[in-house]
Each structure stands twice: as C-alpha cells, then as structure tokens.
C-alpha cells in the first residue's frame, strides 16, 4: 500500500509539472506570436533625497565598523524616489523609483541597484520596469539591465543608462538622469 501511494504521488507531481510546462509554453507562444515587439525610449530624472523631513531614501543598514571607509561597503538604503521629466524636483513627476541600493564593493564605490520604476502618468500609467544591476557611481555613464516589467511593459527587457546630473557632497542628495531603452510587446 505504501509503495503504491508513493508511486501515485510521484506520478501525479511529474504529470502536473509536464502539464504546467507545456501549457505555459503554449500560452506564452500564442501571446508572443500575436503581438509585435517594439522599442521604447524615455528619459526620467531620479531624485535621491537623503536629507530633510521629506527624504525619499532611508538607511536600513549601516556598514559594519570594520568597513567604515569611503566606499560604503555594507550600506543599504531603501528608496521611494521621485522620477521627474526634468532635473528640477518641482517639474512634473511621472513616476517613482522604489526598491533599494547597497554598497557592494570594498575597493570603490559600487552599488547593487534593485528597483522598480513605477510609471504614474501618461500612456504608461500603471506600468513598471525592473532594474537590477551594478552601478559604478563614478563612471560618467553606467549601464544596468532591465530584467522585466508589467502593464504595457510586460515581457520587457533592455537597459538603462544612468548619468549623474548633480551630487551634493554635503547632503548626499543626488539627481541622476536615466535613459531607458526597452523592448516589449
């Protein structure tokens, strides 16, 4: 009886996995064959406000004492940064960058960026893109991959190019231009 039950459970799970993979492939194939892939480019300005009463970036982990050097290794900040059309914070806000960044290099200032750009205005209102990658902040232009999206950016892939527009050494506040290049359906 025990061996029959084991056989039945293993067979059922195997069959379920096969059906899920076949069904999933069929649905994805049908969806992709009916839609034309397009390239979208847009530019936003990312405002990392770390000081003041209305900060959009908060420290959730400070570096361990043995890594208190200038690289920020071990630092982690949670963000809900405004995305605007121009470098001025008072310009039209079109979305928010929500996620975190963390200091991941002991040798230089290198960050792991994990964030969603939630679009709140215009044609792409309600859509998101997900950025996950390394940001070498002292490079003039940094490239990070877009690994997915939702809404009108479903099945998105592509990259963003980040360029620091302004960085205040005293406050730590930054304005970064993001050029987003997306392939999506």
From Swiss-Prot:
GO terms for biological process: phenylpropanoid biosynthetic process. It is found in: Secreted, Extracellular space, Apoplast. Glycans are attached at residue 125. InterPro entries: Allene_oxi_cyc_Dirigent (IPR044859), Dirigent (IPR004265). Residues 1-16 form the signal peptide. Its main location: secreted. GO terms for cellular component: apoplast. It holds the Pfam family Dirigent. Keywords: Apoplast, Glycoprotein, Secreted, Signal. It comes from the Eukaryota. Disulfide bonds: none annotated. Belongs to the plant dirigent protein family. Homodimer. Dirigent proteins impart stereoselectivity on the phenoxy radical-coupling reaction, yielding optically active lignans from two molecules of coniferyl alcohol in the biosynthesis of lignans, flavonolignans, and alkaloids and thus plays a central role in plant secondary metabolism. This is Dirigent protein 19. It comes from Arabidopsis thaliana (Mouse-ear cress). The lineage of its organism: Eukaryota, Viridiplantae, Streptophyta, Embryophyta, Tracheophyta.
């Amino acid at each position: 009886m025990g061996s029959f039950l084991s056989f039945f459970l293993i067979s059922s799970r195997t069959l379920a996995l096969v059906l899920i993979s076949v069904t999933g492939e069929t649905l994805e194939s049908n969806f992709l064959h009916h839609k034309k892939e397009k390239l979208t480019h847009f530019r936003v300005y990312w405002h990392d406000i770390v000081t003041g009463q209305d900060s959009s970036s908060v420290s959730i982990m400070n570096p361990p004492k043995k890594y208190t050097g200038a690289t920020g290794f071990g630092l982690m900040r949670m963000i809900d940064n405004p995305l605007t059309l121009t470098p001025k914070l008072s310009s039209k806000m079109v979305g928010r960058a929500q996620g975190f960044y963390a200091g991941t290099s002991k040798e230089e200032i290198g960050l792991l960026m994990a964030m969603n750009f939630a679009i709140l205005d215009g044609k792409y209102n309600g859509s998101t893109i997900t950025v996950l990658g390394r940001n070498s902040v002292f490079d003039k232009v940094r490239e990070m991959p877009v690994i997915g999206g939702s809404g009108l950016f479903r099945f998105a892939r592509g990259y963003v190019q980040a360029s620091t527009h302004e960085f205040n050494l005293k406050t730590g506040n930054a304005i970064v231009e993001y050029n987003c290049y997306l392939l999506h359906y």
